[in-house]
C-alpha cells in the first residue's frame, strides 16, 4: 500500500478478507492529507511538526523521495492554519513547518507545482509562496515559536530571510543542505546550485540575520568523488562554519 492510498484502505482490507491480493501503490498528484487531523502518538505537548508539502520534483540522483512520495504539491494554507490553531489551543508552544523542500511551497488552488504555469490569471494572482505562508503563520500565532525544514538552496529566497528577521517568534535557524562542496559532484548529484551560489546565499543570510544558526546535510564518498572533490567539501565547511550537520 502506497502512502497516498489511505482512502482505499477499506477496499483493500475487504479484498484481503476475501483471500485476494490487495495492492495500491498509485501516487496522487493532488493528495496533501490536508483534511486529516493527525493523531500524535508520541507527543510532548510542546512542539509539533506540521506538513505543508508532499513529494518533490528535484530528482537528486541520490534520493528516492520523488519515486515514493510523487510530484510536489502544496497544502491549502487555510488547512495549515487550522491545524496550527488546534495545536495552539491544546497548549503547544512550538511548531515546525515541514516539507521535503519548504521554500518551494506554492499554493494556487491545488495540484502539482509543475502545473502552475497552466494556472489561470486569478490563480496566479492569488497564489501563496513560502514567504507568504511563513508571514501568515508568524502573524497569526505570535506566541508560538516557528521553525521550518528543509530548505533547498536553489529555492531559498531573500524574502524568506527577511520575513524571519521581521518576526521575533521565528527561530533564527535554517537547515540548508549543500551535499557537497565540489561543483563537479553537485552536477553528478543533479543539484541545481553551485558552490558559489550556495556561499552567496550564506553570505546574504548572515547579512540579514547575523546570529542565524545554519546546519547542513553532506554526502562524502559519492560515486566518482576524488580526493580533490573531498577537499573542496572540507574547505566549504571551513568557510561556512556550520553550527552542526548531518553527514
Predicted feature residues:
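Proteins enriched for Cys/Gly/acidic motifs involved in redox and nucleic-acid/cofactor modification
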Residues: 1-105, 129, 159, 196-207, ...
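OB-fold and OB-like beta-barrel modules that bind single-stranded nucleic acids
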Residues: 9, 174-176, 245
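Generic structural signal for secondary-structure transition and capping sites
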Residues: 18-21, 142, 169, 242
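Conserved SAM/AdoMet-binding glycine-rich loop
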Residues: 89-227
Amino acid at each position: 500500500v502506497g502512502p497516498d492510498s489511505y482512502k482505499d484502505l477499506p477496499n483493500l482490507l475487504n479484498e484481503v478478507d476475501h483471500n485476494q491480493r490487495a495492492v495500491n501503490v498509485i501516487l496522487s498528484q493532488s493528495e496533501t492529507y490536508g483534511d486529516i487531523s493527525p493523531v500524535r502518538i508520541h507527543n510532548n505537548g510542546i512542539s509539533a511538526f506540521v506538513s505543508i508539502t508532499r513529494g518533490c520534483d528535484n530528482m537528486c540522483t541520490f534520493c528516492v523521495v520523488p519515486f515514493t512520495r510523487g510530484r510536489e504539491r502544496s497544502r491549502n494554507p487555510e488547512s495549515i492554519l487550522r491545524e496550527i490553531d488546534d495545536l495552539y489551543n491544546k497548549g503547544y508552544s512550538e511548531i515546525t513547518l515541514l516539507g521535503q523542500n519548504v521554500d518551494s511551497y506554492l499554493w494556487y488552488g491545488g495540484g502539482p507545482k509543475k502545473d502552475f504555469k497552466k494556472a489561470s490569471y486569478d490563480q496566479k494572482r492569488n497564489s501563496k509562496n513560502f514567504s507568504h505562508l511563513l508571514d501568515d503563520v508568524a502573524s497569526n500565532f505570535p506566541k508560538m515559536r516557528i521553525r521550518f525544514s528543509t530548505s533547498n538552496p536553489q529555492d531559498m529566497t531573500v524574502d524568506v530571510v527577511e520575513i524571519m528577521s521581521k518576526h521575533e517568534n521565528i527561530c533564527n535557524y535554517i537547515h540548508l543542505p549543500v551535499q557537497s562542496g565540489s561543483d563537479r559532484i553537485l552536477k553528478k548529484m543533479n543539484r541545481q546550485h553551485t558552490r558559489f551560489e550556495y556561499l552567496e546565499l550564506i553570505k546574504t543570510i548572515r547579512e540579514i540575520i547575523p546570529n542565524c544558526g545554519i546546519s547542513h546535510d553532506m554526502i562524502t564518498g559519492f560515486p566518482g568523488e576524488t580526493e580533490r572533490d573531498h577537499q573542496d567539501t572540507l574547505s566549504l565547511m571551513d568557510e561556512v562554519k556550520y553550527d552542526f550537520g548531518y553527514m
